[in-house]
Amino acid sequence: MVVKVGVAKLGNIASGVMAELLLDERADREDMQTFMATSGTKLQPEDIDRVVSNMKAWKPDFAIVVSPNGVLPGPTGAREQLAAAGIPVIIITDDVTTKKEWEEVKNSKFGYIIMKADSMIGARREFLDPIEMADFNGNLVKVLAITGAFRKLQLALDKVIDQVKAGKKGTEIELPKIVMTTDKAVDGEFTNDYALAKARAAHEIAIAVAGQNVKGCFMTKEWEKYIPIVASAHEMMRIAAVLCDEAREIEKAGDGILRQPHKKDGVLVRKTKLVAKFE
């Protein structure tokens, strides 16, 4: 059986850059296929409608809806339309900001993976040009990858694929309900305690970036004040990426990097030694 996984990208977060790639890292899996539809950078109704119509036409076994601020009308409407078409939906988004919004997500029929460290960017014109945008996202992808946040996301999605392969469909599928805290991200990722400490620090810094960018983008009006605020947030993310590099180099020095690739049938194999066969 070939499982059809739909990925609807509405706007951009770092998790959306990698969502389908994490499931088929060498493009050689034979047990699943992905279809990605995107609204581009915007969340306008016409952009959302285009994504939803293409996704419904493809008829995936389940769909992943990736967006910033997943409680906005656009992403909310998209997942409601997909669910109405009988497609199980998993939300991947950045941190949900209020208790009311969180309760609505938690009590909904949708699966969710809340990526707390997938922080918003410093989107002030006086600061953010295309290169700054790309640099920030590159640092953030590194943090989410090396801390373990991406692995936990990938494993959760693989479990859903496995359920479909086992014959489950629709409401029979158990969808993930995960808040990606620092504890959850780093769990089982490191053999060296100093590497673990650096990764924890990196993930916590990345979470804190969101607060600074909210302050700089929405709470501060004077340009001479908000420019340094958003710039400082990007410096925080850069340091988080440096800490991740340091953590990985420590793990390399002890020949302890965990590798878990997919086989062609989707089964995960693992090893922790570079020059070694899989366990």
UniProtKB/Swiss-Prot annotation:
It catalyses: 5,10-methylenetetrahydromethanopterin + oxidized coenzyme F420-(gamma-L-Glu)(n) + 2 H(+) = 5,10-methenyl-5,6,7,8-tetrahydromethanopterin + reduced coenzyme F420-(gamma-L-Glu)(n). Pathway: One-carbon metabolism; methanogenesis from CO(2); 5,10-methylene-5,6,7,8-tetrahydromethanopterin from 5,10-methenyl-5,6,7,8-tetrahydromethanopterin (coenzyme F420 route): step 1/1. Its EC number is 1.5.98.1. Keywords: Methanogenesis, One-carbon metabolism, Oxidoreductase. Pfam families: MTD (PF01993). InterPro entries: MTD, MTD_sf. Signal peptide: none annotated. GO terms for molecular function: ferredoxin hydrogenase activity; methylenetetrahydromethanopterin dehydrogenase activity. GO terms for biological process: methanogenesis, from carbon dioxide; one-carbon metabolic process. It comes from the Archaea. Catalyzes the reversible reduction of methenyl-H(4)MPT(+) to methylene-H(4)MPT. Belongs to the MTD family. This is F420-dependent methylenetetrahydromethanopterin dehydrogenase. The lineage of its organism: Archaea, Methanobacteriati, Methanobacteriota, Stenosarchaea group, Methanomicrobia.
